[in-house]
Amino acid sequence: MGGCHHERVPCSVLVVDDDAAFRQLATRVLTGWGHVVVGEAGTVAEALECATQVRPQAALVDVGLPDGDGFALAERLAALPWAVRVVLISADADCAAARSAEQVGARGLLPKEQLSSQELRRLLENG
């Protein structure tokens, strides 16, 4: 008999990025992993409105949004009663930004190039 097969439970994810093409790519990656993208947003305001309507379990949030800061949004999402698991993404992630991500309650911060990485999958799925 083979080893133990761990069934991954799909989670509902909100994708927040001002680049529609990136949101589309993220949606393809996440649904390919078996997750359900329950909403997309291009701004902080849209993300907060969407989050209260669809109550996602997790969110993939860009650091740079046109109407605000992804770190502040991450803090607000993580503080919601159902405690959204937030992973921040950035075109130019560095160590200082990664520390800031953890301080606001995010699971971590990854460069956008690592969208399809196992690290992102681990951060989103480990509730």
Q: Positions of the model-derived regions?
A:
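Non-catalytic signal-transmission and effector/linker regions of two-component phosphorelay proteins
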Residues: 1-12, 117-127
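Two-component/phosphorelay signaling modules centered on CheY-like receiver
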Residues: 20-39
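Acidic, metal-coordinating helix/loop segments flanking the phosphotransfer/catalytic sites
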Residues: 40-58
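Acidic catalytic/metal-coordinating carboxylates
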Residues: 43, 69-72
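Active-site residues of response regulator receiver
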Residues: 62, 90
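The feature encodes the CheY-like receiver
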Residues: 66
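Short amphipathic alpha-helix used as the core "switch/output" element in two-component signaling
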Residues: 71-82
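Alpha4 helix (beta4-alpha4-beta5 surface) of REC/receiver domains from two-component response regulators
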Residues: 72, 93-110, 114, 118-122
